[in-house]
A protein has these predicted regions:
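Residue-level signature for short turns and capping positions that connect secondary-structure elements
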Residues: 8, 41-43, 76
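Extracellular/periplasmic metallocenter environments
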Residues: 51-95
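Short amphipathic alpha-helical surface micro-motifs
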Residues: 18-19, 40-43, 68-72
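Short acidic, gly/pro-rich beta-turn/loop elements at beta-sheet edges
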Residues: 13, 35-37, 46, 69-71, ...
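Histidine- and aromatic-enriched segments that form or immediately flank copper-ligand environments
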Residues: 3, 28, 32-52, 86
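Beta-strand cores of secreted/periplasmic/IMS beta-sandwich domains, seen most often
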Residues: 1-7, 11-36, 57-65
């Protein structure tokens, strides 16, 4: 999954991921440093990595729970930092 952070947004491709399979997030930034945090449907932080300009950091996660996951920036990156939220969906293809 390709992820890029920018003031003050995340771009995510694709936005639907499979449950029960390892997913690799390739995370970068187009401007300043950002903190890439993945939160499960219950609001718990389940993984994090730095998003930095000029670098691609890899985060690997396996999602056992279907539902809506949120991405939040956890490193202050400017005045609208608090609005830097995105989401993706995890679906179970076995159902």
């Amino acid at each position: 999954m390709k992820v890029a952070g920018g003031q003050f947004y995340w771009t995510i491709d694709p936005a639907v991921l499979p449950a029960h399979e390892e997913v690799s997030f390739d995370v970068t930034s187009v401007d300043v440093n950002h903190g890439f945090g993945v939160y499960d449907p219950d609001g718990r932080l389940i993984g994090s990595v730095q998003a930095m300009p000029g670098y691609v950091n890899d985060l690997r996660l396996t999602f056992d729970k279907v539902g809506e996951y949120r991405i939040r920036c956890f490193e202050y990156c400017g005045l609208s930092h608090h609005n830097m939220i995105a989401s993706f969906r995890v679906e179970d293809g076995r159902e």
